[in-house]
């Protein structure tokens, strides 16, 4: 190990919130590596730091150790998937964190290397991402491919990594006393990785499987089209994902791929380009000694970052691209190329413009286009990913989800956007708007909620590349300098000549389609008429409906803390108390005495009369709620800018309303919401738009095979779940008259169960309950009229199979989801949950190691407990574009048969590692008020009310021996056991043939019709 010392060490240089108790030190090693060391006193709240434990464990494999951020952009259009209604939110693997007396936090680290996909050689595209994968495949000191992740998994940790355009980030978290051992293994990524030839072929397949997850994603397809149609030779003009074709194809063309990644590694993986963050409970001196010792052997190198050559604009001006969508969507995507603005971070001119162009209040583009019936959502700004924020340019985007009529008005919409830009130029930059953003930024910084340690480490390591060290935390929040001239200069780039237009729609048809070569997506390139370009350049007028937003009424001024005691012993903290228990409502209350921030979270579950009694009622309720959200949007949006968030969702017959954030304005916002909800009746124009949006959502349901398999499983498990195709059919016939007739009945009887948690006194919580009483003068809904879901009880020895084809006819991925039904929860018992969680902890890595790393079945290989309306189960899931469901199920079955041997061979020390790691997870301290609220709320929603659930589960785990786990496995997973009850859901990709099932039908019950199956099934009593 290195005998190097740090060249410099700076304490108290990092600007941090006055509420942040952590200590920060910045050090620089002789090799140029810069490290931010963070001492978190809450990791060892008891004060004494025990000796670190380092074991040379050699079992297991990766948990979730790779993934490229630009490759996983899977959030596009999720709000239109229509899948949330069917997926049981009670089926949640994250149970309540116990409020025990030994709560602990994890330690973590992250390394950001200043090189990314922009440096891929043209002959081997995706190389930087491939290199990221290869660093997990063992090092000289720790040659086993799974050593790093095996160590983390055994000690309550996990890892991840992602490749961006100009940097690559690796990060992990681990149980606090194993930080040094984890750092030993982690540091070798950057000292002596093996990058073995025999591992390369497998990891090419892993990269290819990862690419196949993105293949049918419209956001990824659009991004790649934008790269492909950028100027030839420009760094944007590349394929950053990488796949088998780009990597194996390079080898077939004579490229030595290993030589390429070794060259890339040697050239850029050196201290001068590395930023390390380590978070631990040890002293800063101890953390510094570890970093110096373990990272001192990293190669020396210059701090000068790689320079990129780019001449001319990224895209041709005056062009419109029409991209055929996978989903039923209409999206107008506009981009303007700005100069790089990282050095102007204290002024944030791009955020000022994003605030106005993306605003949703009265007078905004969003409000205007919505009133026209052309748009359903609008967002604007410079994205956080590397392709939008680079040293070459900032790319300012505006994404507008269109209605059918909006699709026909694209040029008109763009015309109004340039009218709004003219308005902004005419009124000139407004300092009061900047001051609002400044106040909100400072407020958010001062009272920032703590993140999980590994996320925080990764964020700060990225920020070390972006900001001076003193602003690695504050840089994202700061609005320090008002510079109207810079804003005016920036607005000079918002011209038609500097604008790229993309339209993504399922409706695009043409005989002149071109093909983007990597994704195979179809697109058309068109010239925008010159007359339009000229009219956009100089609008003759600005519509009177467009104007600047009003001043924000929800920015708080009162930050006083309600908790009197300065330091409260965790042991003395009480659970939520029921302060109101009446036929109309039940209110739970807990004053926050832990985080002491001026925030509160108020959650409400509102049972509505007859909301789930039939598919028609269900749809009318959804229509009403979606129209109500539409009506509330301007108020809710304004509050969200001031960090006071609102969500409104449906779960069965229950409307869930959440209002959370800075507490001062919560009563005012709730009063406004309920006043509108009390009397709201929709109009025909908005009814048509919302109905169209819902229809599109149902058509887009289950386009992703993984979502589809989960949906099918829940469809068979839940007694009353309305099929999305049936809902689409019934929705088509519903009218506004149907809805207006239904609303009074829906609102006639309700029951509310609520939780008020945070910086609220008991009197304030009671006042919130009174807002409901005063606003909603309705009758209470009797308990017998509230819907309670029942779960199918599979018969003894059940071996069920459900086969369906993928919904998207171009989807190559197949999925097998194998579900084992265990038992319903027993009252006040945590034993089943404890065994399930421990079983998962033990088998997760061997499963990943066998089926993904060794057999390369696919990118998604996972398992875990499932809790469906308080009925326990366990799932194995594999998604593959390479193999069909029969083969996948066979390999999963083979692994399950081998589990008994795996458990038998597990030595006592390893078993104890897994058990103590699981206990550490359960007793991990909630990182934020919001996290604790969500834990408490899950107990209320499930009607369990065991607010110390995880503490009890941890205690239960201490009594569970290896023989208990083996016995439990034999009871529920061994095929000969009558209690082995399983359901295999198989979703068949477009390249597979379901006729394979004909040779695979022995001793199984094939379910052809879910309704018919449930009509003859037995059900467990409803528990929630």
Curated annotation (Swiss-Prot):
GO biological process: proteolysis
Cofactor info, note text: Binds 1 zinc ion per subunit.
GO molecular function, one term: metalloendopeptidase activity
Entry GO terms, CC: cytosol
Region (Disordered): 41-103
Required cofactor names: Zn(2+)
Reaction(s) catalysed by this chain's protein: Hydrolysis of polypeptides, preferably at -Xaa-|-Arg-Lys-, and less commonly at -Arg-|-Arg-Xaa-, in which Xaa is not Arg or Lys
EC number(s) from the headed UniProt entry: 3.4.24.61
Active site: 132 (proton acceptor), 203
Keyword field: Hydrolase, Metal-binding, Metalloprotease, Protease, Zinc
Bias kind Acidic residues: ranges: 52-95
Residues that, per the record, bind Zn(2+): 129, 133, 210
Family: Belongs to the peptidase M16 family.
Function, in words: Cleaves peptide substrates on the N-terminus of arginine residues in dibasic pairs.
Protein name: Nardilysin-like
Natural source organism: Arabidopsis thaliana
């Amino acid at each position: 190990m290195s005998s190097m010392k740090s060249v410099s060490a700076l304490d108290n240089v990092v600007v941090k919130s006055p509420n942040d108790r952590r200590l920060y030190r910045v050090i620089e090693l002789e090799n140029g590596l810069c490290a931010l060391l963070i001492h978190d006193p809450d990791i060892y709240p008891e004060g004494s730091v025990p000796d670190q434990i380092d074991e040379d464990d050699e079992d297991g494999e990766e948990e979730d150790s790779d993934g490229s951020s630009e490759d996983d952009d899977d959030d596009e259009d999720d709000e239109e998937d229509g899948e949330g209604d069917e997926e049981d939110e009670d089926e949640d693997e994250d149970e309540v964190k116990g409020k025990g007396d030994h709560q602990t936090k994890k330690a973590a680290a992250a390394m950001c290397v200043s090189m990314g996909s922009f440096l891929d050689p043209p002959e081997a595209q995706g190389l930087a991402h491939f290199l990221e994968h290869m660093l997990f495949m063992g090092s000289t000191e720790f040659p086993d491919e799974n050593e790093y992740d095996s160590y983390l998994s055994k000690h309550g940790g996990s890892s991840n990594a992602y490749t961006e355009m100009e940097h690559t980030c690796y990060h992990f978290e681990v149980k606090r006393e194993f930080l040094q051992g984890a750092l030993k293994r982690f540091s070798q990524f950057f000292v002596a990785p093996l990058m073995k030839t025999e591992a390369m072929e497998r990891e090419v397949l892993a990269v290819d499987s990862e690419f196949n997850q993105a293949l049918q994603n419209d956001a990824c397809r659009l991004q790649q089209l934008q790269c492909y149609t950028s100027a030839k030779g420009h760094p944007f003009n590349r394929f950053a994902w990488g796949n088998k074709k780009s990597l194996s194809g390079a080898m077939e063309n004579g490229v030595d791929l290993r030589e390429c990644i070794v060259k890339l590694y040697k050239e850029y993986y050196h201290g001068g380009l590395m930023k390390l963050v380590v978070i631990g409970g040890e002293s800063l001196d101890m953390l510094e000694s570890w970093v110096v010792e373990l990272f001192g052997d990293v190669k020396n190198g210059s701090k000068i970052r790689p320079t990129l050559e780019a001449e001319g604009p990224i895209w041709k001006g005056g062009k419109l691209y029409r991209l055929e969508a996978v989903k039923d969507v209409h999206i107008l995507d506009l981009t303007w190329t700005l100069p790089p603005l990282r050095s102007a971070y204290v002024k944030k001119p791009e955020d000022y413009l994003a605030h106005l162009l993306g605003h949703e209040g009265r007078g905004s583009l969003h409000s205007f286009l919505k009133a026209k019936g052309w748009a359903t959502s609008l967002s604007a700004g410079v994205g956080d990913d590397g392709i939008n924020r680079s040293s070459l340019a900032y790319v300012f985007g505006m994404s507008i989800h269109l209605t059918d009529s909006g699709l026909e008005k694209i040029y008109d919409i763009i015309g109004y956007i340039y009218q709004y830009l003219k308005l902004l130029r005419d009124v000139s930059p407004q300092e009061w708007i900047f001051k609002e953003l400044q106040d909100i930024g400072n407020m958010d910084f001062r009272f920032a909620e703590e993140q999980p340690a590994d996320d925080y480490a990764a964020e700060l390591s990225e920020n070390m590349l972006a900001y001076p060290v003193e602003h690695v935390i504050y840089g994202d929040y700061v609005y320090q300098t008002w510079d109207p001239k810079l804003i005016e200069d920036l607005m000079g780039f918002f011209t038609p000549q500097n604008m790229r237009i993309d339209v993504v729609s399922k409706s695009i048809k043409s005989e002149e389609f071109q093909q983007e070569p990597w994704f195979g997506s179809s697109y058309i390139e068109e010239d925008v008429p010159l007359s339009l370009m000229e009219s956009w350049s100089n609008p003759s007028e600005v519509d009177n409906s467009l104007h600047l937003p009003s001043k924000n009424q929800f920015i708080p001024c009162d930050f006083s803390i309600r908790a009197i005691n300065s330091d409260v012993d965790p042991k003395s903290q009480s659970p939520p108390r029921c302060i109101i228990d009446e036929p109309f409502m039940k209110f739970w209350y807990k004053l926050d005495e832990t985080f002491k921030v001026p925030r509160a979270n108020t959650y409400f579950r509102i049972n509505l009369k007859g909301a789930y009694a039939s598919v028609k009622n269900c749809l009318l309720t959804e229509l009403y709620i979606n129209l109500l959200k539409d009506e509330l949007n301007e108020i809710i949006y304004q509050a969200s800018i001031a960090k006071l968030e609102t969500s409104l969702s449906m779960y069965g017959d229950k409307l869930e309303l959440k209002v959370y954030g800075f507490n001062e304005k919560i009563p005012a916002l709730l009063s406004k919401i309920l006043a509108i909800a009390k009397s709201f009746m929709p109009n025909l124009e908005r009814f048509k738009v919302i109905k169209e949006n819902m229809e599109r959502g149902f058509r887009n349901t289950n386009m992703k095979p993984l979502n589809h398999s989960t949906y099918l499983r829940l469809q068979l498990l839940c007694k009353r779940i309305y099929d999305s195709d049936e809902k689409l059919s019934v929705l088509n016939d519903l009218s506004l008259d149907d809805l207006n007739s239904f609303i009074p009945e829906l609102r006639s009887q309700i029951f509310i169960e609520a939780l008020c948690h945070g910086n609220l006194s008991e009197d304030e919580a009671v006042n919130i309950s009174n807002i409901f009483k005063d606003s909603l003068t309705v009758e209470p809904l009797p308990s017998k009229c509230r819907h309670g879901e029942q779960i199918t009880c599979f018969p003894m020895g059940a071996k069920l199979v459900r086969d369906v084809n993928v919904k998207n006819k171009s989807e190559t991925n197949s999925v097998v989801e194998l579900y084992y039904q265990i038992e319903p929860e027993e009252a006040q018992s945590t034993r089943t949950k404890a065994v399930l969680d421990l079983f998962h902890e033990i088998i997760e890595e061997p499963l990943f190691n066998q089926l993904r790393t060794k057999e390369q079945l696919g990118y998604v290989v996972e398992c875990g407990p499932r809790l469906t309306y308080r009925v326990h189960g366990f799932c194995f899931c594999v998604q593959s574009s390479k193999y069909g469901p029969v083969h996948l199920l066979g390999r999963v079955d083979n692994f399950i048969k081998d589990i008994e041997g795996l458990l038998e061979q597990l030595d006592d020390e390893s078993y104890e590692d897994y058990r103590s790691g699981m206990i550490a997870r359960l007793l991990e301290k909630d990182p934020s008020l919001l996290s604790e609220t969500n834990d408490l709320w899950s107990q209320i929603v499930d009607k369990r009310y065991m607010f110390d659930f995880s503490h009890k589960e941890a205690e239960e785990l201490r009594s569970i021996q290896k023989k208990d786990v083996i016995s439990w496995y034999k009871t529920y997973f061994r095929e000969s056991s009558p209690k082995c009850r399983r359901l295999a859901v198989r979703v068949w990709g477009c390249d597979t043939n379901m006729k394979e099932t004909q040779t695979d039908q022995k001793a199984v019950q094939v379910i052809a019709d879910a309704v018919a199956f449930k009509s003859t099934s037995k059900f467990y009593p409803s528990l929630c």
